[in-house]
Amino acid sequence: YKTQIVQAPQMTMTSHLAKENQAEAAINGSYFNVKTGAPTTFIRLDGIVRGETTRAEAFRTDGAISTDKNKIKIHAFDSITSKKLGKKYKNILAAGPLLLKNGVRQMAPTFPENTGKATKGNAHSSDVPQGFFKRHPRAFIGITPDNQIMMVVVDGRFKKHSVGMSIDELSYLAKQLGMRDALNLDGGGSSTLWNN
């Protein structure tokens, strides 16, 4: 299958975007401005930068997914690697947190009680909202050791049905599913998985 990153010119449903691009399967991507639909994380499509990571998203944007010659890769991504990776790959989308890299669970920021400050992990800011790491609906993409792509959505916010997962639980799930690399995508109400 051909694997690609696509961006709608305006806010649209994952299913509509998938159908427009004749996709067999699709998952929502990274974070965006809910008023304008503009991306709030780095995205480069067909060699053109379409968005940069905003300061508000930097705390959780420590990974990226690229497509090149129908291959997908998941990378560690920060302000230093963004320029290098952004030039190397014509199609790349930043997101996060990074859940797995080479089979190793990545450490999410932790919060000592009553401090409200992140002290460990991949935090880029001490202003990480604690709520981000609570259980929520989640979406993530991963690659197995034999280069199979897995797209996963975890439902949430329904007490009797599903409460969602924390970032730590999500990285554990990615490991249990046999992924080598995995990247969290925009979750919450954006969590969408579609197949034809």
PLM features per residue range, with description:
Residues 30-35, 81, 147, 156-159, ...:
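Solvent-exposed loop/turn segments at secondary-structure junctions
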Residues 1-76:
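Zymogen propeptides
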Residues 34-39, 75-76, 83-85, 108-109, ...:
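Extracytoplasmic/secreted cell-surface and envelope-processing proteins
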Residues 171-196:
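Charged catalytic cores and adjacent phosphate/nucleic-acid-binding surfaces used
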Residues 103-105, 110-111, 116-176:
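Domain-core and long-helix interface of multi-subunit machines
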Residues 60, 69, 91-94, 99, ...:
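Short gly/pro-enriched beta-turn/loop segments at secondary-structure junctions
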Residues 35, 66-73, 77, 101-103, ...:
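Short acidic-glycine loop/turn motifs at beta-strand connectors
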Residues 24-28, 63-66, 73-74, 140-142, ...:
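Structural recognition of the beta-strand scaffold that forms the well-ordered cores
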